[in-house]
Amino acid sequence: MRPGDGNRVTGDSMSRRIVIVGGGIVGVCNALALQRAGHSVTLVDRTTPGRETSYGNAGVLSESSIGVLNNPGLLASLPKLLMGRSNSVRFSPLFMVRRLGWMLKFLSYCTTSRWQAAGRALRALQTLSLDQHKAWIAEAGVDDLLRYGGWTKALRTTESFEAYAGELALADENGVVYSVFDESQLRQIEPGLKPIYKKAVLYDETCGVSNPAALTDAYVAMFVESGGTVLQASVSGLSQGESGWHVGLDGADDLSPDDVVIAAGAWSAEIAGWVGYDLPLGWERGYH
């Protein structure tokens, strides 16, 4: 079974007991996919699934967000970013010092070839993901949550649009469908916007959901109806032995699965650290 296949699988391979740590949309989607691959899956979260970051996000289902942050133009803008003269990023100097090796490697990937390779990989992943979401949304009977109409990036100056040319070239190389609008056309399609934008790019195939929490709830319901288990408990420990994993829980009995998936968002690095992984994980600001 390829990842993202929405069909249930009775299984050609041996079923395994799997614990998913984290009940956001990523953890829930992992739970559904693994369950349909024939495995016995338990989803663990300290709160009701979908009530952390997955509750307050924009609900965008994109197949066009393929330009990674360490792009060829980042090095030129680095002095401005480091001196705090940009509203687009805030960072912790202490974090950067502690992760200097990782930061230098991150910057070493600011080349055109590596940026293009990352774009191709993201395009393949996002296209598959969008198709899967549409299939699961239909299966869950929550088509009313799905919103078509694309996603618009508005640019205030002609210069900023020209600087965006690299993103559009990457989109062209990967078959992303988009439309470019001038100032007057933008006012026609988005009359509520202030008249401060000179250009806009509409990514036509992008869609979204009106209520991300409701979508997560619908996926969880499918998971439970198919025999999945949801535990509301805090993960207090994680260790690996000869016979499998041990997951310590506060609020429920400990678990002993064959495999563990860590999908705990901003808390994933801490949990992974319990078993020896040192992940230089960063995260964006909270949404709510």
Q: Can you annotate each of these PLM segments?
A:
Residues 15-24:
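Beta1/beta-strand and adjacent pyrophosphate-binding region of the FAD-binding site
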Residues 36-55:
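Glycine-rich FAD pyrophosphate-binding loop
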Residues 31, 35, 222:
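Gly/Ala-rich phosphate-binding loop of Rossmann-like dinucleotide-binding domains
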Residues 27-28:
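N-terminal Rossmann-fold NAD(P) dinucleotide-binding loop
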Residues 183-189, 231-245:
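A conserved short coil-to-beta-strand element within the FAD-binding core of flavoproteins
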Residues 56-124, 144:
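Glycine-rich active-site loop/strand segments that organize a redox cofactor
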Residues 100-221:
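Rossmann-like flavin
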Residues 47-52, 251-288:
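Central helical "cap/lid" subdomain
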